[in-house]
Curated annotation (Swiss-Prot):
Molecular-function GO term, any one: thiosulfate-cyanide sulfurtransferase activity
Principal cellular location given in the protein's record: cytoplasm
EC category: transferase
PANTHER family: FAD-DEPENDENT OXIDOREDUCTASE (PTHR43031), THIOSULFATE SULFURTRANSFERASE GLPE (PTHR43031:SF6)
Gene3D superfamilies (alphabetical): Rhodanese-like domain
Domain Rhodanese: 17-105
GO biological process, alphabetically ordered: glycerol metabolic process
Catalytic reaction(s) noted: thiosulfate + hydrogen cyanide = thiocyanate + sulfite + 2 H(+); thiosulfate + [thioredoxin]-dithiol = [thioredoxin]-disulfide + hydrogen sulfide + sulfite + 2 H(+)
Entry-linked PROSITE patterns: RHODANESE_3
Name of this protein: Thiosulfate sulfurtransferase GlpE
Classification via SMART domains: RHOD
Keywords (A to Z) from UniProt: Cytoplasm, Transferase
Top-level taxonomy: Bacteria, Pseudomonadati, Pseudomonadota, Gammaproteobacteria, Enterobacterales
Function: Transferase that catalyzes the transfer of sulfur from thiosulfate to thiophilic acceptors such as cyanide or dithiols. May function in a CysM-independent thiosulfate assimilation pathway by catalyzing the conversion of thiosulfate to sulfite, which can then be used for L-cysteine biosynthesis.
Length: 108
């Protein structure tokens, strides 16, 4: 995959449930602590190395941000780092928390 693919939150949720991809959240620490998808890994400059050690390049990665804009840049960056399949989630956490309120965790 030379380019990331945009997917909606329903497709992202399905991929997560079926363990077809991992989910990363790139929002700031305060926003992440105030609510994030239950299975999301908080991806920051400080946690990138750990994420890359724990997830092979053939692991599909879904990137979530606030509304689905910042995630596109991060998705492109992950492709450049060597990940084979990367998705940007349209609507971001804002839409996720509306569609899946039971699957929101709080705290860091």
């Amino acid at each position: 995959m030379d380019q990331f693919e945009c997917i909606n939150v329903a497709d992202a949720h399905q991929k997560l449930q079926e363990k077809e991809a991992v989910l990363v959240d790139i929002r700031d620490p305060q926003s992440f602590a105030m609510g994030h998808a239950v299975q999301a890994f908080h991806l920051t400059n400080d946690t990138l190395g750990a994420f890359m050690r724990d997830n092979d390049f053939d692991t599909p990665v879904m990137v979530m941000c606030y509304h689905g804009n910042s995630s596109k840049g991060a998705a492109q960056y992950l492709l450049q780092q060597g990940y084979d399949v990367v998705y940007s989630i349209d609507g971001g956490f804002e839409v996720w928390q509306r569609q899946f309120p039971a699957e929101v965790a709080y705290g860091a």
